[in-house]
Amino acid sequence: MKRIVILTCPLSETVCTGGSCLKAFNERIRAFSRYKRENMELVAFMKCSGCGHFPGQDKGLDEKIQYVLDAKPDVVHVGICASKGKEKRKFCPEIEAITTIWEKAGIPIVRGTHSEF
């Protein structure tokens, strides 16, 4: 069973229902097509705590990060909404800080859900 977390940006909430990420997950398309032959479980669908909220400075964010660590996911998929810049290839500083913690814990990070970047 592939245990998966999806991380997205709260700034996208005005235009995003999460439906495209969930559709890609449920239909095993786009970034989730790599799991075509595996059982999958979505163990968390989370947003960071917003711009300016970094690990170690925001208790709620720290709790969310720890929840993911405790859930022991096999992989974290980061939505394109968490990218920045004209080319949409880099994480914002907050997402970069969060994913670095998980990577150091041995959790692979995949750039993409319904869109890959």
Indicate where each model-derived feature is located:
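Flanking helices and flexible, charged tails adjoining ferredoxin-like Fe-S electron-transfer domains
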Residues: 41, 101-102, 108
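Proline-aspartate-enriched helix->loop->beta-strand connector
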Residues: 72-73
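Flexible loop residues that form catalytic
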Residues: 81
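Short Gly/Thr/Asp-enriched flexible loops that form oxyanion-binding sites at enzyme active sites
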Residues: 87-102
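Divalent-metal-activated hydrolytic enzyme cores
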Residues: 106-117
